[in-house]
């Protein structure tokens, strides 16, 4: 009972004050607006209000519209609010509708109405360009209109922030944004009379669907590429529209106009004006949506996307292609959306102002460029545009700076700790420069997620020519030098000099190096003639190596060198024939799988340089001379030839520096029996 007692006043308030006057001739539109958005109003105030008028405001964040009566009606409203406590309840309900204070949204009305001829049309947060406005009807006394999406309405509803009177007729000029200290008046898009007080504009509301993405670019001043062939916009324009007559027919199109009178250039890491814009450019500036003309029900049913709109600097493109919008480089532009009601035969009638509506979203401003200037914009395009592979592959060669200090990092940025699998691979400072660890893709360390730049994968900079580059598998013949990630001479996988313990040393290092192999990476099979064919992986078998008897490996004694390993050229040839993935590298395979303890390497003498020139590398590196398709990418090792051995891929200065520091002539044959003793006894 108490709950009903508390709710009944608010229910009665909603019934009394959520009514739209039936005296308005366009009742169908009012019902549609009432259905879509909550409107709080009184009905008796319409009788004594001056002729039809309305002021609305399109907001950028929390969108709402405040309708105010004429200034001469304000004392009456104050008196009625004193007499009736019900109105106070309405005011409280209206002020706390979205849980915000009233002073955040409600702006006081100017007591000195401006002249109708000088009141410009304004739009939050920038002044906008619209056609001449006309008096629209007022639903009643001070009320508020709450919308739950970013909304910028027609020019006829945007005079609140410019302090124009409710009866004001905003001029047709375009007050451009004042943030750079310039004011520029442009011509209206539609020329029609502004002296028809009986006509009422439509109440269409337009929502910018991908507004969060636009705002992210707008923070750094959006740039759009223009080419001779035409380049599509990204982000593209995508809208949702409501409030149209479902049975009427409309043309919806976009035009692109100059946003200010300046010519711009990128200097000192920011855009600065330099001279006046060229306003005498000829060319198409309008892009009609392919679905035009169509019914209001069609336009309101789905998202209206302009993804096929192309920007070009070819002035002759307008002669043969309606999809091209001709722009000039280094000029700032503002796209506008136009909704025009047409006749049944498709002809436009712009003599009636209610048929033409223009919508402008300031966050869609951009500067036309022939090449991206701001690296922040480049990074955002890489992160969000699925078709940015063209310059994503070459990003590290153009922009080699560190991306870790960017203001807008990619959501898929990997931390620096993922570049090196663990503390065991502590690198010298010269090997781990900032330009090599820039924004490395997470997918490179998780093969199950896919490493390619195809749709549906994490998109980031693959660093084709950078550090830890697995892209070499796609282009094994790339002539550019590779920067190989190698371990220091005293830190060869940090194997202990005393013993090889499966649980502590070998398994620990292998798990650190190949911690993601469980996602589907196969081990390198090491089968040869006379063996069982069971592959020897880099990990301990789940059943344990100790469970296998020595006779399993060709019946050899524990601690001795296995005869099935290729210690001769004939055995190497047999192994290469049995396993095509080894090929010419089978010759030094035994030495590859026998890392030396640091103590044993001191007194070793060189026996065969070809057997001693293998060094351990992280599994994410793909060897240049490898021909496999990536299945064994994480399992192969990189063979580094000595400095005096001429090889085709030894052109990297970084590699030569490393080889000079290492003693490449250490022999690992002494410890080979101890190495295989690990497989037999552990």
UniProtKB/Swiss-Prot annotation:
- Which residue spans does the record list as DNA-binding? 213-393
Residue(s) carrying Phosphothreonine = 408
The record's listing under SMART domains reads: TBOX (SM00425)
Q: Where is it made, tissue-wise?
A: Brain.
Polar residues bias (residue ranges) = 58-68, 462-472
Q: Where in the cell is it found?
A: Nucleus
| UniProt GO MF annotations | chromatin DNA binding; DNA-binding transcription factor activity; DNA-binding transcription factor activity, RNA polymerase II-specific; protein kinase binding; RNA polymerase II cis-regulatory region sequence-specific DNA binding
Give the result of residue 389 to E, as annotated: In IDDAS; de novo variant; localizes to the nucleus but forms abnormal aggregates; no effect on transcriptional repression of FEZF2; does not affect homodimerization; severely decreased interaction with FOXP2; loss of interaction with FOXP1; does not affect interaction with BCL11A
For bias kind Low complexity, which ranges apply? 108-122, 619-629
DNA-binding keyword on record = yes
Annotated GO biological process = amygdala development; brain development; cell fate specification; cerebral cortex development; chromatin remodeling; commitment of neuronal cell to specific neuron type in forebrain; conditioned taste aversion; gene expression
Q: Where is this region: Disordered?
A: 43-83, 108-127, 447-483, 588-658
Query: What Pfam families does the database record attribute to this sequence?
Result: T-box (PF00907), T-box_assoc (PF16176)
CDD domains named in the record: T-box_TBR1
Impact noted for substituting residue 271 to R: In IDDAS; de novo variant; does not affect nuclear localization; no effect on transcriptional repression of FEZF2; does not affect homodimerization; does not affect interaction with FOXP2; does not affect interaction with BCL11A
Phosphoserine sites (modified residues)? 410, 594, 641
- What function is annotated for this protein? Transcriptional repressor involved in multiple aspects of cortical development, including neuronal migration, laminar and areal identity, and axonal projection. As transcriptional repressor of FEZF2, it blocks the formation of the corticospinal (CS) tract from layer 6 projection neurons, thereby restricting the origin of CS axons specifically to layer 5 neurons.
Q: What is this protein called?
A: T-box brain protein 1
Give the gene symbol.
TBR1
